Every structure is written in structure tokens, then in C-alpha cells.
Amino acid sequence: MKRSCSFSFLFILLLTICIFSPLPLHAEKKGALFDAQTIYVPAYSHIYTGNRERPFLLTVTLSIRNIDPNHQIKITTVDYYETQGKLLRKYLDKPVILNPLESLRYIIPERDKSGGSGANFIVEWESDKLVNPPIVESIMIGARSGQGISFISRGEEIILSK
């Protein structure tokens, strides 16, 4: 009987914690529709290896994927910044339309280390309808002496203060 009460108490305690614990921001936004966003995307033109912090150069691919199956979106800004926040490159002269399920990519070659280990992109998009927000991420890949590395960084929506 005592063991049954202990398990019941633990079950109720666990259930209470699950019900009343706050959900992370990501869970609240899942499934939300938007008509515009500004997205910060971490990128790494190199990372450091070993005790001497030797740079390991990486190729960076910025991927922008319109995941809405029914509506196009307009990409209005794709800017590349270096570690200290200085603008290195503006990729767009005019907006680019991404049709439903269409993808777009921008490449930073492995030999271009101007961005540094703290490089990033700012991507802005808009739509005349509420749509599923695009997936915006950077993919880093590099190989040296038979060693290879690859990883991704997912973009995060930011709010620009005016």
C-alpha cells in the first residue's frame, strides 16, 4: 500500500510539473503563420582546432526554403556580416520571389575567411498573405587531411528596433 501511494504521488507530481511548466518559445510558434520576418542566421567561415586554435576553413551555404505549398514569398534582404558585425556583402540588388516549395542558396567559398568564426547573415522576407515561414539555415562543411566536418545552424527570428 505504501509503495502504491509513493508511485501515485510521484505520478501526480510529474503530471503537475508537465502541465504547469512553461513551454519554450519555439513550441509556441510552431504552426504559426507570418507575413514577414527578419531572420538572424549564424555562419562559420572557420572554426578552431587543437590547443593552438588553428583555423579549420569551411564552405558556408546559406539555404532559404519556402516551405509553404501554396504561396510565394519575397526575399528582400540577404546580407552577410563578419564577426565584429561589419557588413561584408549585400547579396540582393532587388527582391527575389520564391515560389511554393522553391529553394535558394548562397555560397561562401572555403578560401573566404573574411567572415570569421562569428559570421552571420540577416535575411528578410515578406508575403502579401499569411504563410508558413521559410526554413533559413546555414550549412558548413570542410575537409582536411582525411578529416571532414559538417554542421548546420538554424536561423532565428529577430525583432529590429526602430
Question: Where is each model-derived feature located?
Answer:
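Terminal connector regions
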Residues: D112-K162
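Short, hydrophobic/aromatic beta-strand segments
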Residues: H71-V78, R89-Y91, P133-E137
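Sec/Tat signal peptide C-region and signal peptidase I cleavage site
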Residues: L23-A27
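Short, solvent-exposed loop/turn segments enriched in Ser/Thr/Gly
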Residues: R54-T61, A119
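Bacterial N-terminal signal peptides that target proteins for export
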Residues: M1-I12
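Intrinsically disordered, low-complexity Pro/Gly/Ser/Thr-rich segments with frequent PxxP/GP/PP motifs
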Residues: T83-N120
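Bacterial N-terminal signal peptides
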Residues: L10-S21
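Asparagine-centered strand-capping/turn motif at beta-strand->loop junctions
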Residues: I64-H71
